[in-house]
C-alpha cells in the first residue's frame, strides 16, 4: 500500500495505515462499470450498507469472501473501510484527558512513528487519530500561543511563492504544524489579506534600504577583521553573532571609507550564516519569486565547484595573476603595506595559502578560511570586477566548463612527457583544477625518477641498428681480443684514408664494401670464400666460426668454447656516421686478423664415418620406422 512522503516533523499526513477513509463522503468518483476497478475511489452509500450487512453475516475473519461480493473492492480495502470508518466501536468524539495521557506515555515508550502499535492500546482509536492528536496537540514542541505579525508575514510570503504546500511552509515556522498553518490561513489570514490588504503595504514599507541596495550589488556580503582603531559604520549593520559582524556594502565607491583591510568577500548563498541568509533570501524573493530558482541553481553550481576543488593538490606558494574573467584585477591586501598598496592576486584554490593572511586563527571565521568559499582581496578592486550576481554565475560556469575540458589536456602536458618508454608507477592524477605552466616545475614532479629520458626519434633512427646475432658475436669478440678500437680521424683526408684502410682489410678478410658519394655507407656484400656443404640451417654467426683460403683450414671447432673460437667478425669493418651533419664521415672499427690453425683437418676413417653419419644398419632401420610412423598421420594446420 502506497504511503505518502513525510513533509514535516509536524505533518499529519503520514501513517503506515494511511488510506483515504472519508466518513460517508459519497460525492467522489464512481467506479467504472463493466470491469473490476481497484483504484482509490470513494466509497458509495450502497457499498457501505452492503459491507455492513456482509460483516454481520460473515464476520471479520475472512475478508476475501466479503470482497467477492464487492466487485470493485479488494479484501484490504474492505478491511480498512470497516476498521477505520464503519466499525461502530470506533470513537469519533473528543479526546479525554485519560486518552491524552495514555498517548503521551505510549509515544515515550514506542516513539512517534509506530502509531498502529499505539492504537492497539487505545480502544476505539485508530493510528491516524493517535498521530494527529500527538502532532497537533500533545507534542510539547508545538506552539499554542497566538500568531505574531512576523509569523503572518512569513506565511504570506511563502504562500505567494509555494501556494497551498503547507508542509513546505511549516518548515519555515518551527513549532507550527502544517494543519495549524492551513487553518490559520483559511480562517483568518486569507480574508484579511484579500479584503483588508493585510501585510501588503506594510511589507513594502518595512523593507529596509539594505535589501534594495543588496540586490543592486550582486549579493555580496562583506566580512572584515578590523584593526582596533577601525570602526565599521553603525547603520545597516545587522549582527549575526557575537564574534563576527556582517555588514552590507551599499555603494562600490564608498567602500574605502567604510571597510577596513583586508576584506573577505563571501558569496551570500553558501557562506553567510543561516539566519542572515534566510533574511536576505526572503527580501530577495519579495519582488521576484522566479529568482529563487536561480538562487538554488547557483547554490548547486557553487557546491559542485567546491567539491571539484576538494581534490586539488597543494600548489607552490607564488604570487600570480588569475586568468579567470571577472577576477583578473583583484589583489591581496598586505598587512605590511599601507591601505592603498596591494599585492598580486590570489586564486581560488585548495590549501592555497599566502603569507599575507593573519596568523591568528580567531581573526577570521571558518567560512573565510574555507577553500573555494571566499577570496581574500583588496577592498577597492573586487567590486570593480564583480558587478552583479549573474556575472558571477557566468564566471562559475566558465570555471566549470574549463575544469571539464581543459584540465585533462593541461595535466597531460605537465605530468606526462611526450616520449616515455617506462610506465609510471603508482601515478594518480588527483588535481582537477587547471594548472599554470609557470607554477609547476618539472623537477618537482613526484615520479621524475621513474621516467625514461625523452629521446628524439630522429636520433634513434639515424644510426644503424645491430642485429642480435652480431651483438652476441661482438660480445664474444670483446672477451677474446678486448674492446674494439676506433681508428683516429684525420682532419683533411678522412674519407680517402678510411677507404684505403677498408680496402686493405676487405682484401684480407673477404668483405667488400661500397660507398656512396652523398649518402651513408651501406654494407652491400659479404663474400664467403669457403662454404660448408653440411651446415645449411645452423646459426651462422653465433655457433660456427670459420675462415680460410684452402681446404686445409679447420672449418669446425670441436672442443674449444665459443670465447676461444675464431669469428668471421674478427676482420670485419663496422661503419657508422659520426654525426647527423656530416653524412660522409665514417667511423671504422677493426680487429686484427685471426691466426691460422696449427694443424689441418684429417679425413675420416672408413669405420668412423658410418657410425658418425648415421649409416649403421640399426640407425637406418630406426630412421625408416620413424618415417613410416610420421607419414601415417595426415598434415594439418597448426593453430597458434
Curated annotation (Swiss-Prot):
PROSITE patterns attached to this UniProt entry: HTH_MYB (PS51294)
Induction: Negatively regulated by microRNA-155 (miR-155).
GO-annotated molecular function: DNA-binding transcription activator activity, RNA polymerase II-specific; DNA-binding transcription factor activity, RNA polymerase II-specific; RNA polymerase II cis-regulatory region sequence-specific DNA binding; WD40-repeat domain binding
Modifications made to the protein after synthesis: Ubiquitinated; mediated by SIAH1 and leading to its subsequent proteasomal degradation. SUMOylated by TRAF7; leading to MYB transcriptional activity inhibition.
Record domain HTH myb-type: where: 35-86, 87-142, 143-193
InterPro entries in the cross-refs: C-myb_C, Homeodomain-like_sf, Myb_dom, MYB_TF, SANT/Myb, Tscrpt_reg_Wos2-domain
Positions of the DNA-binding region: 63-86, 115-138, 166-189
Region (Disordered): 336-368
Subcellular compartments: Nucleus
Region named Negative regulatory domain: 328-465
Entry remark concerning the domains of this protein: Comprised of 3 domains; an N-terminal DNA-binding domain, a centrally located transcriptional activation domain and a C-terminal domain involved in transcriptional repression.
Protein name, entry field: Transcriptional activator Myb
Organism whose genome encodes this protein: Homo sapiens (Human)
Amino acid at each position: 500500500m502506497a504511503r505518502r512522503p513525510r513533509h514535516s516533523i509536524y505533518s499529519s499526513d503520514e501513517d503506515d495505515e494511511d488510506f483515504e477513509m472519508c466518513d460517508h463522503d459519497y460525492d467522489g468518483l464512481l467506479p467504472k462499470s463493466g470491469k473490476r476497478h481497484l483504484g482509490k475511489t470513494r466509497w458509495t452509500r450502497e457499498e457501505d450498507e452492503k459491507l455492513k450487512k456482509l460483516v454481520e453475516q460473515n464476520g471479520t475473519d475472512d475478508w476475501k469472501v466479503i470482497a467477492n461480493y464487492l466487485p470493485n473492492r479488494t479484501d484490504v480495502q474492505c478491511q480498512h473501510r470497516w476498521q477505520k470508518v464503519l466499525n461502530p466501536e470506533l470513537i469519533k468524539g473528543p479526546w479525554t484527558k485519560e486518552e491524552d495521557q495514555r498517548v503521551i506515555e505510549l509515544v515515550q515508550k514506542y516513539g512517534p512513528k509506530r502509531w498502529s502499535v499505539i492504537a492497539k492500546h487505545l480502544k476505539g482509536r485508530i493510528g491516524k487519530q493517535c498521530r494527529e492528536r500527538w502532532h497537533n496537540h500533545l507534542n510539547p514542541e508545538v506552539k499554542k500561543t497566538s500568531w505574531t505579525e512576523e509569523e503572518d508575514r512569513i506565511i504570506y510570503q511563502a504562500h505567494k511563492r509555494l501556494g497551498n504546500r503547507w508542509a513546505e511552509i511549516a518548515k519555515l515556522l518551527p513549532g507550527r504544524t502544517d494543519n495549524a498553518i492551513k487553518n490559520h490561513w483559511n480562517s483568518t489570514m486569507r480574508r484579511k489579506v484579500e479584503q483588508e490588504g493585510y501585510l501588503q503595504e506594510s511589507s513594502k514599507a518595512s523593507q529596509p534600504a539594505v535589501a534594495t541596495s543588496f540586490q543592486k550589488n550582486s549579493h555580496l556580503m562583506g566580512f572584515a577583521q578590523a584593526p582596533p582603531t577601525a570602526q565599521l559604520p553603525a547603520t545597516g549593520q545587522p549582527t549575526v553573532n557575537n564574534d563576527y559582524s556582517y555588514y552590507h556594502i551599499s555603494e562600490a565607491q564608498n567602500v574605502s571609507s567604510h571597510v577596513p583591510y583586508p576584506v573577505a568577500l563571501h558569496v551570500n548563498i553558501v557562506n553567510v550564516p543561516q539566519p542572515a541568509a534566510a533574511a536576505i533570501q526572503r527580501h530577495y524573493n519579495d519582488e521576484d519569486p522566479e529568482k529563487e530558482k536561480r538562487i538554488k541553481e547557483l547554490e548547486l553550481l557553487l557546491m559542485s565547484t567546491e567539491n571539484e576543488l576538494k581534490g586539488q593538490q597543494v600548489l607552490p606558494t607564488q604570487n600570480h595573476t588569475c586568468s579567470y574573467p571577472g577576477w583578473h584585477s583583484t589583489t591581496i591586501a598586505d598587512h605590511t603595506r599601507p591601505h592603498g598598496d596591494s599585492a598580486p592576486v590570489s586564486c581560488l584554490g585548495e590549501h592555497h595559502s599566502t603569507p599575507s593572511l593573519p596568523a591568528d586563527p580567531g581573526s577570521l571565521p571558518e567560512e573565510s578560511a574555507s577553500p573555494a568559499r571566499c577570496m581574500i582581496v583588496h577592498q577597492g578592486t573586487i567590486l570593480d570586477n564583480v558587478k552583479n550576481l549573474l556575472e558571477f554565475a557566468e564566471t562559475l560556469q566558465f570555471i566549470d566548463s574549463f575544469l571539464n575540458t581543459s584540465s585533462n589536456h593541461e595535466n597531460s602536458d605537465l605530468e606526462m612527457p611526450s616520449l616515455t618508454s617506462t610506465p609510471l608507477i603508482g601515478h594518480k592524477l588527483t588535481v582537477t583544477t587547471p594548472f599554470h605552466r609557470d607554477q609547476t616545475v618539472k623537477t618537482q614532479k613526484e615520479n621524475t625518477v621513474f621516467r625514461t629520458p625523452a629521446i628524439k626519434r630522429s636520433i634513434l633512427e639515424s644510426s644503424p641498428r645491430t642485429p642480435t646475432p652480431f651483438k652476441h658475436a661482438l660480445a664474444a669478440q670483446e672477451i677474446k681480443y678486448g674492446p674494439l678500437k676506433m681508428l683516429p680521424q684525420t682532419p683533411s683526408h678522412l674519407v680517402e684514408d678510411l677507404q684505403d684502410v677498408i680496402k686493405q682489410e676487405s682484401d684480407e678478410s673477404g668483405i667488400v664494401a661500397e660507398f656512396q658519394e652523398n649518402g651513408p655507407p651501406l654494407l652491400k656484400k659479404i663474400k664467403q670464400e669457403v662454404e660448408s656443404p653440411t651446415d645449411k640451417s645452423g646459426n651462422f654467426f653465433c655457433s660456427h666460426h670459420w675462415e680460410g683460403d684452402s681446404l686445409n683450414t679447420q672449418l669446425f671447432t670441436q672442443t674449444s668454447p665459443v670465447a676461444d673460437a675464431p669469428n668471421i667478425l674478427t676482420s670485419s669493418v663496422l661503419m657508422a656516421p659520426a654525426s647527423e651533419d656530416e653524412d660522409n664521415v665514417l667511423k671504422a672499427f677493426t680487429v686484427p686478423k685471426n691466426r691460422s690453425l696449427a694443424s689441418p683437418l684429417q679425413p675420416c676413417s672408413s669405420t668412423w664415418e658410418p657410425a658418425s653419419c648415421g649409416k649403421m644398419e640399426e640407425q637406418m632401420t630406426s630412421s625408416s620406422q620413424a618415417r613410416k610412423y610420421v607419414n601415417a598421420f595426415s598434415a594439418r594446420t597448426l593453430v597458434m
